[in-house]
Amino acid sequence: MIKEVTDQYNAKEIETKVHEFWEANNAYRSVREHRKGAKKFYFVDGPPYTTGHIHLGTAWNKIIKDSILRYMSMNDHDILDRAGWDMHGLPIEVKVEGALGFESKKDIETYGVGNFIEKCKEFALRQKDDMTEQFQTLGVWLDWEDPYMTLKDEYIEAAWWTLKQAQDKNLLETGKRVVNWCPRCETAIADAEVEYEDREDPSTYIKFKLKDEDNTFVVIWTTTPWTIPSNIAVAVHPEFEYSKVKAISENSATEILIIASELVENVLRIGRYLDYEILSTMSGKDLEGTVYEHPLADLVPLQAEIEHRICNADYVTADSTGCVHIAPGHGVDDFEVGVKNEFPIFCPVGPNGSYTHEAGKYCGMNILDANRVVMDDLLERGLLMAERMISHRYGHCWRCKTAIIYLATEQWFLKIGELKEDMLEEIKKVNWTPEWAGSARFKDWIEGARDWCISRQRYWGIPIPVWKCSSCNSLTVVGTRKELIERSGADPHIELHRPYVDKVTIPCECGGTMKRVEDVFDVWFDSAVASWATLRFPHQKEKFNEWWPADFITEGHDQTRGWFYSQLGASMVAFGKAPYKNVLMHGFTLDGSGKKMSKSIGNVIQPAEVIDKFGADTLRSYVLSASAPWEDLKFNWDELATVHRTNNILWNVYRFPLPYMALDDFDPQKVSYESVEAYLRSEDKWILSRMQTVIAEVNKAMDARLLHKAMRSINEFVLEDLSRWYIQLIRPRTWVEADNPDKLAVYRVLYDVFVTTAKLIAPFMPHLAEEMYQNLVRNIDENAPVTIHLCDWPVVNEALVDTSLEAQMKVARSIVEASSNARQKVGRKLRWPVSRIVVSPTDENTIAAVEGLRSVLMDQTNAKDIETTKVGESWNELGVESTPNPGAIGPVFKGNAGNISAAIGAMDAYDLKKGLAGGEMEISLADGTNVTITEKMVNFSETVPEDVGSAEFNCGVVFVDAKLTHEIESEGYSREVIRRIQDMRKELDLDVDDSIRGHIQISDERVLDLVLDFENYIAKEVRANVLVIGLDVETTGELAKEWNVEGIPMTIAISKEE
């Protein structure tokens, strides 16, 4: 039996109850098992790092995923949705280092790599459990019992297998290249892991002396003076013009400088030169091969052995000096220039960011501390032209926030550059939401892609499965645990992490011993193999063939250069195709002013904070409806509260008929739609049609991954169609005591609409949907699906669709709104009836709407009658006013214009309008002369009669005739009395079926007579078995109150009838 529910939407109570219900009934597993054998839908969960509490961004991410998966499940899809966890890498290591008080890799080595690995594992697993609980609080359904975890050996084997494919396809290589380097973590980091922040650095202009020309210098500019000890060359653009300038300094010294011609004046101004003369010009091509002296060759002995010369490079820009200092060991472009020109790759900097012995004087110094020392040495030699500080964007390590450097180191690379064109072709086959995420943003990133550095010089990660012979230097890549055991004789149960796997050796064909290289994988390579590792590939090839590639993935827009990219790269290496079919790119969560949420700023909002205040479903519906998924979400507490009010309105709409249904023992199994179809009114047919339209709208939006449109369609339906319209139309029909078919028709319609609405909100607000379903369906039919999430998604019933009726009702609602506005103008409350409303329409459809929905309009406008004029015609009871138009009269009648205006003003407006119907008419002036005037010389306006209000709407004008009659006053005062008594019933907390005794004292005899005319009506409406109304009635009872009703004092007393 359907039960009544609480007055208020108590999200926390409902969600706790629903979670317990799901757990007790193993709901998630039941839903997944129920869809076995249906069309497969493979979802890969982009794995969050197990580093701590979830934040609003990760909450939004999982809510999007959960909503789409619930929708697909109800649409009969067999879903594979293992939750994913990224459990390796610096995100974990830095957290553990912080907990242990470590500051460098040396501390880890001292502590013991094995001990550190165990601490990382413990931390990752503990945080995984905590975060799982937080996601479950949001109502997120994934396979939490069998998640994929990158620390598991089966997952590690998928990564190993992938690297072996790279080797087999000649896509794996090792060598020295310049990479992003974190000197604190002492490891390479990916481009996607570099976070840019503003910082101040030296802006220095430095002179390099030409070897064979006295007092002649090429001028370079740099913000990294610490790289000068590593300088090998100077690059100029081959097509730029350069000037050889004779410059006079402040001390009147003369020197010759080489600078890009268009930059000469700016550079000399910065260098504080007094005057200059251009001696000659040449192209960058002419400068190629010019030899210069290293400015610090005496301090860095190895530099004295190297010939330094000017070379050409097309990437040089016409800013600063037009001459670029080249240090191949400290810049990606510099490295490429070095390789092209066969320069030595000189890199006298160690992994901790300190100079090595190769740096001579600077050995042991931290490079950033050395900036000042280098500049002083240059100054001492007269080679520092200028220095100042500038603020610019500079890269920092994503985890420890240390400023990165560029360092030439030995690394392992996947040859992504060779696959670039194939990758670009593959992404064209992927369905992107929004479209430009793939065709523009992702495409641009791939076009600029370089070979992927997959190695990291750390501990907690997937060990790179490369073994190298210490005798002959030959390499081998191991693809699986089985292969490793077979080739090494290692313990079959060996763990595949460091330091355990480091101890395993493999015999080499040369008779030597192969040892594993110490590097671990880039953590992005871990998650890159997720789509096949999730399927336990390579061990379960059949499952892989059934499910792969993924049908759907979604992550934030930063993942165009992160997970979307790494997956594509690894998949192209392994399989030669994209690993996903459909991608939704979503935005970031920001604070209300559009700033990134940050603990340091203090603007972070935790999901738990929102849930404690409003509940998980409100958070879910807010993040899903507030903006398009791909737009950044600016979190706003007021907007969140508005969404919560909308959910509360849904609750109240759902709650409204339940007491009446319970009182009447309404059983939808016994009252079929067919049994009441003949008794459906226009409003019933309309809401059923609107329900079908909303189903179609939600289907269209969800199929296009436009979750915001789906949510907004549902919210609009609940707010505008159900709460503000349909419930108002049918409310009196639910109060009828008799078991009549009209009331049963309303019950049946409401029931169907509520059950369908519950199914529509199930993907988005699963807790509220479940609560509604259990009461409406399971309380009636114990054989119905145990949970709403086992139900099929609503299907549009074309037989119920009536687009014409929907259009007419839209017009009717506009008329009602206009009528309300017109009432306000004459000060007449809606509670008071009016004798009629008149609609002056602009089209025939409006007339059809009025005629088709006359009873609805009369009821909602509280009018005794409704009339229409012909299309385009004014109401014939309107008055007409006329005024002369000086702008049209003056140019024609010149000095006589005043007399013409006076004559027009003295005439009857109706006569004028009639006379000018043909365009012009003749009028007489005061002096007896006649003149001809045109219609443009008179302005006409309509006036409404007294006690009539008017208001325009999009299809015409509504007039409300608010003249008072005896009957209207009687009904008006009676309705005022009824409202007061109903308020008093609520104050006494009476049930809808409780009867009362009432006594009403009215001091005004005229009003008393008016109210007495509706005595029986009042008694019926307030369920009064006894109702006494008079001048001197004794007003005692359980509750007595004095009221001022339209200026008339009244005292009302009521008591519950026992």
From Swiss-Prot:
Gene3D superfamilies according to UniProt: 3.30.720.200, HUPs, Isoleucyl-tRNA Synthetase, Domain 1, Valyl/Leucyl/Isoleucyl-tRNA synthetase, editing domain
Lineage: Archaea, Methanobacteriati, Methanobacteriota, Stenosarchaea group, Methanomicrobia
Annotated EC: 6.1.1.5
Residues holding ATP: K599
Keyword Protease: no
Job of this protein: Catalyzes the attachment of isoleucine to tRNA(Ile). As IleRS can inadvertently accommodate and process structurally similar amino acids such as valine, to avoid such errors it has two additional distinct tRNA(Ile)-dependent editing activities. One activity is designated as 'pretransfer' editing and involves the hydrolysis of activated Val-AMP. The other activity is designated 'posttransfer' editing and involves deacylation of mischarged Val-tRNA(Ile).
Catalytic activity: tRNA(Ile) + L-isoleucine + ATP = L-isoleucyl-tRNA(Ile) + AMP + diphosphate
Keyword Ribonucleoprotein: no
Natural source organism: Methanococcoides burtonii (strain DSM 6242 / NBRC 107633 / OCM 468 / ACE-M)
A GO-annotated cellular component: cytoplasm
Subcellular location, record wording: Cytoplasm
Similarity section: Belongs to the class-I aminoacyl-tRNA synthetase family. IleS type 2 subfamily.
InterPro entries documented for this protein: aa-tRNA-synth_I_CS, aa-tRNA-synth_Ia, Anticodon_Ile_ABEc, Ile-tRNA-ligase, Ile-tRNA-ligase_type2, M/V/L/I-tRNA-synth_anticd-bd, Rossmann-like_a/b/a_fold, tRNAsynth_Ia_anticodon-bd
Motif stretch ('KMSKS' region): 596-600
Domains: entry comment: IleRS has two distinct active sites: one for aminoacylation and one for editing. The misactivated valine is translocated from the active site to the editing site, which sterically excludes the correctly activated isoleucine. The single editing site contains two valyl binding pockets, one specific for each substrate (Val-AMP or Val-tRNA(Ile)).
Cofactor(s) needed by this chain: Zn(2+)
Keywords: Aminoacyl-tRNA synthetase, ATP-binding, Cytoplasm, Ligase, Metal-binding, Nucleotide-binding, Protein biosynthesis, Zinc
Residues spanned by motif 'HIGH' region: 48-58
UniProt cross-references to CDD domains, sorted A to Z: Anticodon_Ia_Ile_ABEc, IleRS_core
Gene Ontology biological-process entries: isoleucyl-tRNA aminoacylation
Protein name: Isoleucine--tRNA ligase
